[in-house]
């Protein structure tokens, strides 16, 4: 019936936030807890979750979400949680607590063993979905600032479920040739909506390149294209910008996104605001990169601030016309090696709402000048 139904603006997407209780402002949007709770409550057949790690019991709200998942799994709802092979530290405890939930570890890069599953998304019944930067941890649900998108528009949920199928094909318990065969079966139906065919102004982008499949857009290509075509403004709220790729303990320069930001400021006079995180999960290069951008563009309209409370929001807005929400840092290692799905939209309402979030964060008491 989808081809004959009118497509709602923004594909019925709503922004979703987690805000720690010690912040000096509150959100007008659905909370991550409310979003996950609604997905669980409305599920009739299945709930699929992809996350680097799974540690929901670390906070009270995370534990409540996990208990609800356990409850519906006991009633026959199929629950599958994908997590990275290197993020399974709490797996034994969770399996003993909830035997009806199927936990699957994946290794998306058995050949080189450098790629991780970074994707943070939920899909249920091919009807509802969440994608953003909230992993399936108690912190992301309760105590760490995150941003994501919830939609109950079935075509969009179905398209995201295709990504789940692809990641699931890299089950680390399978032999490599089975992984390849399984993944190959996913590729022909890998996506329906992309930058040239958005639905309601919305589409997904993917990483890394070897997992793209048929007609998917590489996240790096879209981000860099948007940065290079920016005319008036670029607003970035990210945990880190790191112009390197790490392989076997060695660092290699990866300036693609970094250079695109500098070129926009110096060559085209684009107004750029960069709000970076500053907590113990940051890469050692992150603050150095922020300072170098500030120094190189001292004669240009580029401003850098540091967010002082744990902030895993990863948001890009270009020319007030395009919004990008992802689970990856602007980091060469993430973009070259790791597996994730990003949300993109040119819908005016969604871009406007995301812009208001950035403006709120930018002027808040938690945002400090880099020079202080």
Swiss-Prot record:
InterPro entries: Diverse_PLD-related, PLDc_3, PLipase_D/transphosphatidylase. It is a lipid-anchor. It catalyses: a 1,2-diacyl-sn-glycero-3-phosphocholine + H2O = a 1,2-diacyl-sn-glycero-3-phosphate + choline + H(+). Pfam families: PLDc_3. A motif (YPPL) lies at residues 153-156. GO terms for biological process: viral budding via host ESCRT complex. Residues 307-334 form the PLD phosphodiesterase domain. One of its GO terms (molecular function) is hydrolase activity. This is Envelope phospholipase OPG057.
């Amino acid at each position: 019936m989808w081809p004959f139904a009118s497509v709602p603006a923004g594909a019925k997407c709503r922004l979703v936030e987690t805000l720690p209780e010690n912040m000096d402002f509150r959100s007008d949007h659905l909370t991550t807890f409310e979003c996950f709770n609604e997905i669980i409550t409305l599920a009739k057949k299945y709930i699929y979750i992809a996350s680097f790690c799974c540690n929901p019991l670390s906070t009270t709200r995370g534990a409540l979400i996990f208990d609800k998942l356990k409850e519906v799994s006991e009633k026959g709802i199929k629950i599958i949680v994908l997590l990275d092979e290197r993020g399974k530290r709490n797996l034994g405890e969770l399996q003993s607590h909830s035997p009806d939930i199927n936990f699957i570890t994946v290794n998306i890069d058995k050949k080189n063993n450098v790629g991780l599953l970074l994707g943070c998304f939920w899909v249920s019944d091919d009807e509802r979905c969440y994608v953003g930067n909230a992993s399936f941890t108690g912190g992301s649900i309760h105590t760490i600032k995150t941003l994501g998108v919830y939609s109950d528009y079935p075509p969009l949920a179905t398209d995201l479920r295709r990504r789940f199928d692809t990641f699931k094909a890299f089950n680390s318990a399978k032999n490599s040739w089975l992984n390849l065969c399984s993944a190959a079966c996913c590729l022909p139906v890998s996506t329906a909506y992309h930058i040239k065919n958005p639905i309601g102004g919305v589409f997904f982008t993917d990483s890394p390149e070897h997992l793209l499949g048929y007609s998917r857009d590489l996240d790096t290509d879209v981000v860099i294209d948007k940065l290079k075509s920016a005319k008036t403004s670029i607003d970035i709220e990210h945990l880190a910008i790191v112009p390197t790729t790490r392989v076997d303990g060695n660092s290699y320069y990866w300036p693609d996104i970094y250079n695109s930001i500098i070129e926009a400021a110096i060559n085209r006079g684009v107004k750029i605001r960069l709000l970076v995180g500053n907590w113990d999960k940051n890469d050692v290069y992150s603050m150095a990169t922020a300072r170098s951008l500030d120094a190189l563009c001292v004669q240009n309209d580029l401003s850098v601030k540091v967010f002082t409370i744990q902030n895993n929001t990863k948001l890009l807005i270009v020319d007030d016309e395009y919004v990008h929400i992802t689970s990856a840092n602007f980091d060469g290692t993430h973009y070259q090696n790791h597996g994730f799905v990003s949300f993109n939209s040119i819908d005016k309402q969604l871009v406007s709402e995301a812009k208001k979030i950035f403006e709120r964060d930018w002027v808040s008491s938690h945002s400090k000048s880099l020079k202080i």
